[in-house]
Regions:
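NAD(P)H-binding glycine-rich loop region in Rossmannoid oxidoreductase-like domains
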Residues: 44-94, 120-123
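Glycine/proline-rich active-site loop of Rossmann-fold NAD(P)-dependent oxidoreductases
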Residues: 162-175, 210-220
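Mid/C-terminal beta-alpha module of Rossmann-like enzyme folds, strongest
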Residues: 194, 201-262, 278-299
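A conserved pocket-lining segment of Rossmann-fold NAD(P)-dependent short-chain dehydrogenase/reductase
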Residues: 176-198
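Conserved Rossmann-fold NAD(P)-dependent oxidoreductase catalytic core, especially the SDR/UDP-sugar
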Residues: 85-134, 153
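Conserved beta-loop-beta element that borders a ligand/cofactor-binding pocket
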Residues: 115, 141-167
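N-terminal Rossmann NAD(P)H-binding glycine-rich loop of SDR-like oxidoreductase domains
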Residues: 3-23
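N-terminal Rossmann-fold cofactor-binding loop
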Residues: 30-35, 51
Length: 299
């Protein structure tokens, strides 16, 4: 298939782009910024695109068989001093379905929306959290566009852990530096609580599965391992050759309370549906391998 990946210069979309290319697909990535030259992502075809502005012409979109959308806005994308609720409305609630509608109208036949796990794993949070509500409405708006000629599904992922050759992901570089003692005198600790994690590799496999076999209009809650945050931080520390950090009930600079929408000290665990996991064809128990890969990249 000829596949357009919006957000393909980021970690999730970039990993999916390289995975899909390795599987024999013809891949073009789209985003606001071109990937660095001399990197694997820099070697892919690139379209400059701001999906919120819906600035790709029908002729450009219509050149593709399939769309993967991995550019949903989260807390990292709110303009400084901006109105968060208004941003979520414009970027997610309005912008994402509008872009999918343009893709459908241009003749793309298959689309996968990479969304957030929160609306399915903890739907109650959408009642009071404007960000989660925006991801829920974006997901529902995208899937409502399904027709016999436009097969669309969502792959809704938890916390994603991964690495892409040639791409610096500041969060994972910071985790690695922290585990190696590079943030001293900042104390070594992990916050209480835990969540489901998935590797970028597992997610890329799920995206491919949804492209090939996804049920029209379906939202798939994907996931891999339920880990405490101590387990998660501990994996980085062990690979760096240092002891697992203790749990301290205070906000962590590298995992702030704003990033734990279900509340520090709580857990958000679940087991993905076995039949859906088999249909999408993604691997499990991949987090420790992935953390080792991350630490090796940034060490």
């Amino acid at each position: 298939m000829k596949i357009l990946i919006v957000g393909g210069n980021g970690m999730i979309g970039g990993h999916a782009a390289l995975h899909l290319r390795s599987r024999g697909h013809e891949v073009t990535i789209a985003g606001r910024n071109r990937p660095a030259s001399g990197t694997p992502l820099g070697g892919l075809d690139f379209l400059r695109c701001d999906y919120i502005a819906n600035d790709l012409h029908a002729a450009q979109l219509g050149a593709f068989d399939a769309l993967v959308f991995a550019a949903g806005n989260d807390v990292r994308h709110v303009p400084p001093g901006g109105d968060e609720a208004a941003h979520w409305e414009r970027a997610n609630v309005e912008g994402v379905p509008r872009f999918f509608r343009a893709a459908r109208d241009a003749g793309i036949g298959v689309a996968v929306h990479v969304g957030s796990f929160y609306p399915q794993a903890a739907p109650r949070l959408a009642e009071d959290n404007a960000y989660i509500r925006s991801r829920k409405l974006a997901d529902e708006g995208v899937r409502a566009l399904a027709t016999d000629a436009f097969r669309v599904s969502s792959v809704n992922a938890p916390f994603v852990v991964g690495t892409v050759p040639g791409l610096i992901v500041p969060m994972f570089k910071a985790y690695t530096d922290y585990a190696r003692g590079g943030f001293a005198p900042m104390p070594d600790f992990a916050p209480p609580g835990g969540v489901n994690f998935i590797s970028a590799m597992s997610l890329s496999e799920a995206i491919e599965g949804a492209l090939l076999r996804g049920e029209n209009g379906k939202a798939y809650l994907v996931g891999d391992e339920n880990l405490t945050f101590q387990d998660y931080f501990g994996a980085f520390f062990r690979d760096a050759g240092r002891p697992v950090p203790p749990v301290i009930d205070q906000e962590h600079p590298l995992l702030p309370d704003s990033a734990i929408c279900f509340g520090r000290g709580n857990t958000l665990y679940y087991e993905p549906d076995a039949a859906e996991t088999a249909l999408l064809g993604y691997r499990r128990r991949d987090i420790l391998r992935t953390v080792s890969e991350i630490v090796a990249q940034y060490s």
